[in-house]
C-alpha cells in the first residue's frame, strides 16, 4: 500500500474510519459454509490468526503485488469493531460488546502461504493487505445474522453471501476469543470470507460492501475500493524464505483448477460392488497370472494370506512406504503427526493399506 496520507485532524488515514489504531486484528480461517464446501473441508471449531494494524488501509488506496509473485487474492469480509472490553463473555452477551460493523478486504498472497504454515504473518500481513471501511454501521441497528457481503472486481460481482451462511455465529466467535484474551475497544475481528474469492492482478479494481438490506434504512458500509498495482520490490532469499507456488496453491487461490487454467484432476478409480464381487470370486493365483500376462512380473500377490482363513480382503490399495529414520526431516514432514499416522487415520471402508518396509 502506498497511501500514507493523513486526515485533516492529523490522524493516519490508514485507520479511518476507526476511532483509533486498533490494538489487534483477529481473523478467522474458515467461517462460511459456502467457502468450506468450496475448499472441501468443514472445521469443527473456528481457528484464528492475527494481522498487524500496519496492514490496514482506507478506501480509495492501492495494494502492491510484490515483484516475483502471482497469487494475490481478495477476500471480502464483515469486520466487527469492538466497543467495550470483553473478557470471558457469554454468547448471549457477546454482541453487546460490538460497536459497529463495516467492510474489509482480507487480501492474501498465496505465494507465501506455505511458508507461514497457517500463521499468515507474511502472506496476509503486508502493508495495505487489510483495507477497511469506508463507513461504520451501528451494531445496534442490525441483526448480526442478516448482514450481506458483496465483492466486485472491475464491476463484475464475484462474491455475494449473507451471515445466515456462517458456520460459527458472530456471538460464538466473540465469546470464544474472549475466553483466551481480552478484546479491547477498537480491536477488529475479521469474520471470514464466503465462496468466490479469487486472484486479482495489477490494474484490477476491487470493491467490497457490507450492508443490512432488511434493517430499517438498509444501512451500508459503502463500497470499499482498492486498486491493485505492480510492486517494484521482491524478496531477498538471504534473509528468509522466498515465494513458492504449485498447482495446489494456484487452484486454491483462483478457486478451482479450471479458473487457474489447469487440467482437471483425473477421475479417481472406483471399486464398484460388481467388480468387488467378481474379484472376491477370482482365485488369487488367477489374478497373479493376469498381472504377469500384462507384463507386471514384480507385483505378484501369490502367497498373500489374510489373518483369518475364511476372509478375503478386496479393496483399493494405498502404499505406505517406510524409510530410514531422518531426524532432520521430522519437522518438515509433519512432526508427530507424520505420513504414517495420517495414512492410518485416512483409511476408509473398502480401502487397504499396503506397508512397504
Where are these regions (language model features)?
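Generic secondary-structure signature for well-ordered alpha-helical cores
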Residues: 54, 85-87, 103, 137, ...
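Extended, compositionally biased flexible segments
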Residues: 1-77, 226, 251, 257, ...
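N-terminal accessory regions of nucleic-acid-interacting proteins
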Residues: 87-101
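Extended boundary segments
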Residues: 27-32, 106-107, 124-163, 289-318, ...
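Short, structured patches in soluble enzyme cores that scaffold and shape functional sites
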Residues: 51, 76-78, 82-84, 102-107, ...
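Catalytic-pocket segment enriched in acidic/His residues
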Residues: 2-18, 35, 41, 110-268
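Short gly/pro-enriched beta-turn/loop segments at secondary-structure junctions
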Residues: 20-21, 73-76, 95-98, 116, ...
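Short acidic/polar capping segments at secondary-structure boundaries
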Residues: 31-33, 54-56, 84-87, 104-110, ...
Amino acid at each position: 500500500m502506498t497511501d500514507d496520507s493523513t486526515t485533516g485532524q492529523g490522524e493516519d488515514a490508514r485507520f479511518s474510519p476507526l476511532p483509533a489504531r486498533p490494538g489487534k486484528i483477529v481473523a478467522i480461517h474458515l467461517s462460511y459454509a459456502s467457502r468450506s464446501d468450496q475448499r472441501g473441508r468443514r472445521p469443527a471449531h473456528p481457528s484464528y490468526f492475527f494481522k498487524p494494524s500496519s496492514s490496514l488501509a482506507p478506501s480509495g488506496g492501492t495494494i502492491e503485488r510484490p515483484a516475483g509473485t502471482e497469487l494475490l487474492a481478495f477476500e471480502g469480509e464483515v469486520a466487527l469493531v469492538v466497543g467495550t472490553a470483553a473478557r470471558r463473555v457469554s454468547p448471549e452477551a457477546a454482541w453487546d460488546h460490538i460497536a459497529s460493523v463495516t467492510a474489509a478486504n482480507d487480501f492474501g498472497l498465496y505465494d507465501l502461504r506455505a511458508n507461514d504454515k497457517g500463521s499468515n504473518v507474511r502472506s496476509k500481513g503486508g502493508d495495505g493487505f487489510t483495507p477497511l471501511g469506508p463507513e461504520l454501521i451501528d451494531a445496534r441497528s442490525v441483526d448480526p445474522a442478516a448482514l450481506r457481503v458483496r465483492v466486485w472486481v472491475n464491476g463484475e460481482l464475484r462474491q455475494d453471501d449473507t451471515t445466515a451462511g456462517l458456520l460459527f455465529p458472530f456471538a460464538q466467535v466473540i465469546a470464544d476469543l474472549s475466553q483466551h484474551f481480552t478484546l479491547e475497544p477498537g480491536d477488529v475481528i475479521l469474520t471470514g470470507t464466503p465462496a468466490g474469492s479469487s486472484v486479482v492482478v495489477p490494474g484490477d479494481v476491487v470493491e467490497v460492501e457490507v450492508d443490512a438490506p432488511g434493517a430499517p434504512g438498509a444501512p451500508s458500509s459503502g463500497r470499499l475500493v482498492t486498486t491493485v498495482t505492480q510492486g517494484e520490490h521482491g524478496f531477498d532469499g538471504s534473509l528468509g524464505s522466498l515465494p513458492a507456488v504449485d498447482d495446489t496453491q494456484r487452484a486454491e487461490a483462483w478457486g478451482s483448477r479450471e479458473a487457474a487454467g489447469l487440467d482437471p484432476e483425473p477421475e479417481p478409480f472406483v471399486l464398484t460392488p460388481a467388480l468387488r464381487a467378481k474379484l472376491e470370486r477370482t482365485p488369487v493365483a488367477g489374478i497373479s497370472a493376469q498381472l504377469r500376462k500384462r507384463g507386471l512380473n514384480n507385483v505378484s500377490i501369490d502367497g498373500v494370506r489374510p489373518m483369518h482363513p475364511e476372509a478375503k480382503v478386496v479393496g483399493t490399495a494405498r502404499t505406505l512406504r517406510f524409510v530410514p529414520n531422518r531426524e532432520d526431516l521430522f519437522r518438515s514432514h509433519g512432526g508427530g503427526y507424520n505420513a504414517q499416522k495420517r495414512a492410518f487415520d485416512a483409511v476408509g471402508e473398502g480401502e487397504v493399506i499396503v506397508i512397504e518396509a
